[in-house]
């Protein structure tokens, strides 16, 4: 027998700044709900990686229209939690620090946002999805049944990012917590001040401060909210 969550799948939009816990929360939540997880940040990182690999960054800084040609041929897809760019698994490559430094700029470009918005909206047509990013609740799915906006103190977010990088570094040097905190603060400024789809909370979004929360606590809060919405729809 199907549960209410399976009978009436909804769209869960999770927004927030870098390292606020969006992706981890969204992945675990989607698995728990039996929903599809779509990592929009990975999509922007994939475009950024392609720009860097093709050596187009300086050209695009001078002339943003140069990116349009690249977007015509790019393919981005997911298999489970693996990310594929033009058929290649780039799940680790898109997390490189050089990508992190440039993704805010690439994300600010209108042709990029238009192209990825189209892809993301197509992915969400069947509902039963959890999507995280920076403009999901405001631009991609403003009518999502549940919109969450995660925040956390920049210092705490830097510690999380540092721990994540150490885990993946295999003994290689990683940026200091202090350097990462400055990078995160700059990223916040870039995301909030960009012309196209700046980072902001939708008026209907539930604000959740994750500074002192574990991942399990974050997931439980959002899972309970999904249940409440589905139960109300079933009445």
Swiss-Prot record:
Catalytic activity: CMP + ATP = CDP + ADP; dCMP + ATP = dCDP + ADP
EC annotation from Swiss-Prot or TrEMBL: 2.7.4.25
Main location: cytoplasm
Molecular function via GO: ATP binding; CMP kinase activity; dCMP kinase activity
Transmembrane segments: none
Keyword Lyase attached: no
Name of this chain's protein: Cytidylate kinase
Organism from which the protein derives: Chlorobaculum tepidum (strain ATCC 49652 / DSM 12025 / NBRC 103806 / TLS) (Chlorobium tepidum)
Gene: cmk
